[in-house]
From Swiss-Prot:
Assembly: Part of the 50S ribosomal subunit. Forms a cluster with proteins L3 and L19. In the 70S ribosome, L14 and L19 interact and together make contacts with the 16S rRNA in bridges B5 and B8.
Function: Binds to 23S rRNA. Forms part of two intersubunit bridges in the 70S ribosome.
Gene3D superfamilies the UniProt entry points to: Ribosomal protein L14 (2.40.150.20)
Any one Gene Ontology cellular component term annotated for this protein: cytosolic large ribosomal subunit
InterPro entries in UniProt: Ribosomal_uL14, Ribosomal_uL14_bac-type, Ribosomal_uL14_CS, Ribosomal_uL14_sf
Family per record: Belongs to the universal ribosomal protein uL14 family.
Superkingdom classification of source: Bacteria
Protein name in UniProt: Large ribosomal subunit protein uL14
Keyword set, alphabetical order: Ribonucleoprotein, Ribosomal protein, RNA-binding, rRNA-binding
GO annotation, biological process: translation
Length: 123
């Protein structure tokens, strides 16, 4: 469950290392974001010569949460860290060209097939 002020890892090669959620998109007064939801983020820590820099405000999709996601068969997929993939504000396509770490199958149901195809492992 990601809410405002939550910090996440960037799971792509866009240049960001740590980001902070500043808004959960999708409805007025929506409090939490789960896997597959789009959030508004600001870059808190970035690497030199990356595509994004510290202070940039962008959209991102949540790909891993500590809370996890419950499957239809009753199993729960949880991760050690919260992570997101940075998106272009207008097209909502990934900024990076590589995805690090696993992503869940729930992203396949939404419009993020590009992220699923770039990911090294889909759980």
């Amino acid at each position: 469950m990601i809410q405002m002020q939550s910090t996440l890892d960037a799971a792509d090669n866009s240049g960001a290392r740590r980001v902070m959620c500043i808004k959960v998109l999708g409805g007025s007064h929506r409090r939490y974001a789960h896997i597959g939801d789009i959030i508004k983020i600001t870059v808190k820590e970035a690497i030199p010569r990356g595509k994004v820099k510290k202070g940039d405000v962008l959209k991102a999709v949540v790909v891993r949460t500590r809370k996890g996601v419950r499957r239809q068969d009753g199993s729960v997929i949880r991760f050690d860290r919260n992570a997101c993939v940075l998106l272009n504000d207008t097209t909502e396509q990934p900024i990076g060209t590589r995805i690090f770490g696993p992503v869940t199958r729930e992203l396949r149901n939404t419009k993020f097939m590009k992220i699923v195809s770039l990911a090294p492992e889909v759980l």
